[in-house]
Amino acid sequence: MSELIDLLENPSVFGISKLPPRATSWPSKRLSIAPDEFLYDIGDWRLPLDGPWKLHWSPVPEEETGGFEAPAFDDSGWDEIELPANLECAGYGTPIYSNITYPFHCDPPHVMGEPPENWTAWAERNPTGRFRRRFVLPEEWRGRRVVLHFAGVQTAFRLWVNGVFAGYSEDSMGPAEFDVTTLVRAGENVVAAECYKYSSASYLEDQDFWRLSGIFRSVFAYSTAEVFIADAAVTADPESGTVRAEVEVERWDGSLSLELVVRDPSGAIAAQASGGRSLAA
């Protein structure tokens, strides 16, 4: 377990194989999308993974994984939980409200030290949830890039796909994305996650709120083409009435062009431009 504790308590490590933050956007099969469809949970190349997951909860991280990340692992004796959910609100562990006092033994960057015996954290030193779910990769995703998206996990988690380590993430309130193209396969796949209530990041995620844990926002997979928009920044100048877009395209060989379309609230085209990676309209 020392290797795991070293990971959780290392402030210089807050992500492993985790994709960089980006502006929210999703690939679509359509060139035109209605204004009311620009929502976080809508996308043509998306596979929702909310709903029933298998769960094993413990008050402290266990020394070995027990092979729970392996596709053949028998999870029939585990509980079932509907995600997204806060574990404490589902009956696993104790919800803790604290203002300025850390709910664990304060010794930065460590979170596994022994607190006073009358603290909840004395018995629940670092509550840990192990999650498993099976999903079938859509046939039309064959040959495309596949990303797993966790919209919110508190406070840290390790991820496996089909028994292979896919990455690690901290930052409870931001999404975590992992490129799992080389890990998924046609047909059934198994995703497994081990989530920890406390990590070195807990020292920054503090003050005046309920201390909860788990996969508390949506989980889904999505697919992009081999050439895809990785990020974009859009700025508007009200004085000149122009919009400028800076677009980061991955694996672009220059053979494709970009098109920028600005629509008014009714959906009508107000301006458009096409060309290279920097567009103005």
Describe these PLM feature segments.
Residues 161, 242-277:
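Beta-strand-rich binding/interaction modules
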Residues 41-50, 70-73:
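N-terminal helix-cap/turn-to-beta initiation motif at the start of protein domains
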Residues 232-238:
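Short beta-strand segments of immunoglobulin-like
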Residues 187, 276-281:
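Glycine-centered tight-turn motifs at strand-turn-strand junctions
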Residues 143-145, 239-246:
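Short coil/turn motif common to extracellular beta-sandwich-like domains
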